[in-house]
Amino acid sequence: MNEIIKAMEERRSIRKFQPTMPTKDDLAQIVEAGLYAASGMGRQSAVIVAVTNKELRDQLAKTNAEIMGKPDFDPFYGAPAILIVLADKSCRTAIYDGSLVMGNMMLAAHSLGLGSIWIHRAKEEFERPEYQALLKKLGIEGEWEGIGHCAVGYIDGEAPKAAKRKDNRVFWIE
């Protein structure tokens, strides 16, 4: 079977991570895969903020959990690295572009033997002044919409089995 298709079929959302940080090289490869995602008109409207700083990671988790309405929950399931995708609000394809970046990164993580999961609420986080200030501090100017968090780390335990694919989701016109 083709390696890319195999990765697509085998990748799962992971909800239990080891605390060990993935290597910088692995994270760089995952980010690079995200940067190669297709984008509308080749605009490359998405940016990635790679968070390996534990203090910031924990602050993001706290904010995300509050937005979720579960203040005592770790929405990143213990993953030590958080790759945040944001997209330029002025680009009409921003959400789609950012979504493809997320997909590429999750597939890349799987291909490197790491687990990942897409965690929402980045939109709400980056509407807050403290996270807009973080972007400004990083030199990211303009209006940005949070697309998602790609939580990445080593899987703690076994990856879940694939759910059965639902029927009646493909309609051929020949």
Regions picked out by a protein language model, each given a short descriptive name:
Residues 1-174:
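Acidic, surface-exposed loops and disordered segments
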